[in-house]
């Protein structure tokens, strides 16, 4: 089991997962998002290859349109 911090809140997962899988679990896959892992921006092209490990800190921002 791993524990990560997502937007300031601790979350536990049964196994390590990649950024894409995390976005799917959070029901925000496919939306315009910016992901930061341990202070580094994760490009969308790297979401499937970037593994989230125990103790990682993530900030996820979802773009919202408006006017």
Say what each PLM segment does.
Residues 1-66:
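Ubiquitin-like/PB1-type beta-grasp interaction modules and other compact soluble beta-rich domains
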């Amino acid at each position: 089991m791993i524990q990560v911090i997502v937007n300031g809140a601790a979350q536990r997962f049964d196994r390590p997962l990649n950024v894409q899988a995390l976005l799917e679990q959070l029901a925000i896959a496919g939306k315009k998002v910016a992901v930061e892992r341990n202070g580094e921006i994760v490009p969308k092209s790297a979401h499937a290859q970037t593994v989230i490990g125990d103790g990682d800190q993530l900030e996820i921002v979802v773009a919202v349109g408006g006017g």
